[in-house]
UniProtKB/Swiss-Prot annotation:
Chief location: mitochondrion
Polar residues composition-biased segments: 335-345, 484-493
UniProt-annotated stretches for the region Disordered: 210-233, 301-403, 479-515
Superkingdom, taxonomy of origin: Eukaryota
Summary of subunit composition and partner proteins: Component of the ER-mitochondria encounter structure (ERMES) or MDM complex, composed of MMM1, MDM10, MDM12 and MDM34.
Official protein name in the record: Mitochondrial distribution and morphology protein 34
Location within or outside the cell: Mitochondrion outer membrane
Any GO CC annotation of this UniProt entry: ERMES complex
Gene that this sequence comes from: MDM34
Membrane topology reported for the UniProt record: Multi-pass membrane protein
Amino acid sequence: MAFNFNWSPLMADAGFYTRAQDLLTTALNKSPKPPIIVDDIVVTELNLGSIPPELEILEIGDLAEDRFRGIFKMSYSGDAFLTLKTRVQANPLNTYLITRPAYASPKPLAAASGLTIPLQITLSNFRLSGFVILVFSKQKGITVVFRNDPLESLKVSSTFDSIPSVRDYLQREIEGQLRILFMDELPAIIHRLSLRLWVPEYRGLDAEARESPAASASGPGEDPLLSPPKDPVDASGNLLSSADIASLSLDSGVEMHSLFSQKNLLRLAALTNSQRTLSLFTPSIREVVFRAWTGCADQGEGAASGVVSPGSPVLSRTHSHISSPLSSLQDASSVLSLQNRSTTPGSSFSGYGLSLGAGRHSKTRPTRKRKKRVVDLRKHNKPADAESVSADSTFTESTTPPTVFSSSVIQEEANDDPVTPPMSPETTMRIPNRQHRFSTSEDKGKLRASVAQQLTYTQPSHSTLHAQRANHCPMIPLSADGAKTSSQQQPISHGSYLAPREKSHEASSAYESNANRSITDAVPNSSILEQAWMMKMANEIARRIQEGKFAANNNYPGAWEQARARTPPPAYGQ
């Protein structure tokens, strides 16, 4: 179904074109303009022509005397035209610099000066085609919505038609702006026009809106000099007196200074400087990055000294390692001893200076005590046996004083991973104090001999075992000459003492336990102190028997044969 428009009422109303021009001018300046346009776009002439658009009704949703809703197919190729005036920038370099940030600009001087030229554009020969949703109501006006882009083509005539590049550029830009106008702004313009035509309430509001700007422009302006601030200052920040304020006037030819309060100026200055500090009152400004600066005094001290203050935290690379419980305790004790020793002013930097200048791949690390496992495989029945374990001392080649500790019995699990013994001697050696043990008095030697006789009398089976061991490996004498004799023996290879290691430990442990049991059975009525002393002597005799066995096959004379003959940790025995 089709019908004809009565286009004459729109042509007869002269006020319609005036209102349409104002609405089009507002709509064209509302959207962001291209940078080449440096002035407002003003609609100077508007004519809808004598040819109405063609409408084809596709659907009617609601039909009554005062309302209508339907979907149309519109096509227009009439003689309507529109004339616009504005000013454009003729220097393309100026336009380029406006659209680029300041840090990326080459900053030309005279070449970047602007050159504005007035421009008049006439739009004609419109070709429109699209689907329109039309809703009419006398109370709500006319609502027109385009479901697609209706603009097909138009003709643009301007002042720069003689320049092809400028003509093509204007053609593209204006077509883009008109497409936005038809889809977004034109429905709102038609709705406001319909409200002014059919709704009396909006007509009265429109009249009041036109009268209010004229009344405000004709009325007297507000004089800021009537109520000056309490502490007025001029543009340079100097305080103004009441006489200076009285001499100022709005109509005077002298340059008018803005009167600001001193407090406001201080706040503005603090606001400007807050973007370069770590102030908590820095305002949150969008798309702004604040640069944090340190104080000049802090920078001067850091540059002069060149050494980081120990009070400040130091970021250093941390290396993790896996250690046994014994080594962890030793490391903790060494750290505590280092902290205790660093109380003097001369050594206050010892714990901190180790991490100074440590880079990402630096090789300088704090000296750490080498892990040394001291394992005692002998079995003890009473806590009093632990006194006999502190026989050796540990000497560590380090910058710190040597730490002497008594090793305790530690049960370690066998490690399945093969461990290669070190090729070079370690810095930490266990040196048995044989000289101290061999320098005992003759009275103690006689007393030990009496204890041995008691053991022989109490346990004849053990004395037989003692005699058999003496035949194979002679005993070490208890005098100082025995130490000299043992030091003249020849060394043997490492493989010679690895084979009978387990058997010797089993035999010594069995003999020690039997000796302890025999002493306990022999003197049941003696005091606790005598029993403890006798058990200590029995342990000493058992240890001497074991040392004598090793000394029989030892070919390494000197003070290091016992260190070589000692049983290594379980990892070396696998």
